Design a protein with these regions (language model features):
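Aromatic-lined, polymer-binding surfaces characteristic
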Residues: 15, 19, 23, 27-236
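N-terminal module-boundary/linker segments of secreted carbohydrate-active enzymes
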Residues: 1-12
């Protein structure tokens, strides 16, 4: 697990790249931007590197940076146009992962502000879900690449204390079992809009089934799509 990994992480061939990426994020000063929300997507992208480094190494400086960025957002006026899927995904990643990594360092007011802002941003995407568009549309690339993953994480994080999160979690689970991976009826491992675009979807494709397998005890990677994926990529 993570505790064991922290003791051996420096021997990993990926350690240098991991810490270099995190260092570049540390060197940025987006939290000092006069209008923090104009740099919020960049903060979120940095948070991806910082959170990974924090969990892998346990070094507090990475969490400190995430916390500074989050507090900058909490102290400013939210962007009323928070609906773009990738922009929202970056902001939600920063908020939820700071909430996770720094929970004990946030006061009750800050925790509540993060929760409120998270659901304020997620509301638009959840309304899209509730209208039935995603399960009936052939395939919304941006939703599956990013918004779905963030919504699933929100559902898991807050389902025990928030009815909307519980609804989101239930929806995401049912949607995955009905329409994923790769639209739900793809069994041959081919990526429907071309293997050259596969890389944009790969994080959702490995993260979600791995997470659901862990939570449910059922191996979601046994789906025929995954069984045939390697061969499909080779012959694409």
């Amino acid at each position: 697990g993570l505790k064991k990994a922290k003791g051996n992480i420096q021997t990993s061939p990926e350690y240098k790249d991991l810490t270099n990426r995190a260092q570049r994020a540390l060197n940025n000063n987006y939290e000092t931007h006069p209008t923090p929300y104009k740099a919020a997507n960049l903060m979120g992208q940095d948070a991806n590197q910082l959170y990974t480094a924090y969990r892998a190494t346990g070094e507090q400086r990475y969490a400190d940076k995430m916390l500074a960025c989050t507090r900058a957002l909490l102290a400013s006026t939210p962007d009323p146009k928070l609906i773009n899927d990738f922009y929202c995904g970056d902001v939600l990643f920063l908020l939820t992962h700071t909430y996770d990594a720094c929970y004990d360092r946030l006061n009750q007011e800050e925790l509540q502000k993060i929760e409120d802002l998270t659901f304020q941003i997620a509301k638009y995407h959840h309304n899209v879900q509730r209208k039935g568009r995603v399960e009936n549309h052939i395939f919304d690339n941006h939703y599956w690449q990013r918004a779905y993953r963030e919504m699933l994480q929100i559902g898991l994080m807050f389902a025990d204390k928030n009815d909307t999160a519980k609804e989101i979690l239930e929806y995401c689970y049912e949607l995955w079992t009905a329409r994923a991976p790769a639209s739900g009826f793809n069994r041959d491992g081919e990526w429907h809009n071309g293997q050259g675009y596969f890389h944009s979807n790969v994080k959702t494709l490995w993260y979600v089934p791995s997470l659901m397998s862990y939570v449910t005890g059922t191996d979601f990677l046994q789906h025929p799509f995954y069984k045939n994926l390697g061969k499909a990529l080779v012959y694409a």
